[in-house]
Amino acid sequence: MLAHGAGLCYIEEAFHAFYKEALGLTKLSARERARMGLLALVVAAAVLFFCSKSSPAYPINDWSDANIYFSAGKGMLAGRVMYRDLYDHKGPLIYALHALCALVCPADFTGVWVLEILFAAAFLLEGYRAVKAMAGRRAALLSIPLTALCVHTSYCFQAGDSAEELALPMILLVQLHWLESLKSEKPVFLGRLLGDGFLFGCVFWMKFTLCGTQGMALLLGCLLDARRNGAKGFFRSLGGLLLGFLLSTLPWLIYFGLNGALADWLKTYLYDNLFLYSSGEGGLLWRAKQMLKSGWEWLSRSPLCALPVCAGVIASCFGRGKTGWQRIGWLLPFLLGALGVFIGGKTYPYYPLALAAFLPCFFGWLGALLEKRLAGLSKRAYPCIAAALC
């Protein structure tokens, strides 16, 4: 009983710490957070009205993946169990999100469009915070519509409503937490470790090939903690992250366990994806050629997104006064993220969209270069420029 009580107290303390940490994530004043959040919401709604086929602007959404997610979500609402009664190879979270959308708007994709807006606004707001830390508020303000333009008008965005699109804010937030830990000598809060592990789990249970960026950021964070605080720091960080991951997994263990579908879930999502879905042709040389081919297609078809991402990551490796950790802070997560995206041998145009999480790196670098010119603009000019970009 004592052990049980101690465990409950630990979990309660962890949730309280996570809540406190979540309130201070943006490091923005309440007024600025509200204003920038509203701007991000308006920009996201405007751009997705034209760029997502889930929008009311389109009479029909003919993209197969979106229809699969939505149909599976409605099936779950009707009592069918994913992987046991319905078959598809994505993770359970994406179907659960679409079940919520179907609960709100069962007849069309309006609920999905609203979901996309919320996730896009969160991504844009996080990008604002990242650029502000690197280049100041002026550049950060302009980065909101520019980021939306680069992401949602690119070829890799396709018709919208992809796992890659929904994963963007979670990928970026974990990356930002890792970069913030470089600036502080204090141990990472338990709440942040729980939150990062939870976000990693959310992406894992949507599409595990998108976890490369987060996985590398979390590993680097553990290694940095080990360097600063020894083995105790490493295992403290690792334990917090694993507990957060467990919290993201627990709902699915309960759901599939109660429905007698644990084996169906794990076989379909993990085994089938790892050994049946990905291409097994050729050897390492063939796979390397396919990865290079896929990377080139991303660069050539989506230059407005791909070129800034690559330029920003490369630029992040240079600069006076940077430590070795800071020089690899963006690079290694990008490389592992790209490996996860391209290594399968089969690459669809929307796969590299997950790498758009690195766009704030470019706008932060560019904003720092143009800082003096941006400082010369009047305050009234920024809303006008932002509106014009929209």
Residue ranges and their predicted role:
Residues 12, 21, 213-246, 317-324, ...:
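Perimembrane helix-loop-helix junctions
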Residues 125, 297-327, 331, 335, ...:
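Hydrophobic, aromatic-rich transmembrane alpha-helices
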Residues 166-185, 192, 200, 221-223, ...:
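Specific aromatic-rich, kink-prone transmembrane helix
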Residues 92, 96, 105-125, 157, ...:
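Loop-to-helix entry region of an early transmembrane alpha helix in multi-pass inner-membrane enzymes
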Residues 114-134, 142, 149, 173:
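Transmembrane-helix motifs of polytopic, lipid-linked glycan transferases
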Residues 212, 338-340, 344-379:
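Hydrophobic/aromatic-rich transmembrane helices and adjacent perimembrane loops
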Residues 95, 109, 123, 145-168, ...:
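Aromatic- and kink-enriched transmembrane "portal" helix at the membrane-lumen/periplasm boundary
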Residues 189-210, 214-219, 243, 247, ...:
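Membrane-interface alpha helices of multi-pass inner-membrane proteins
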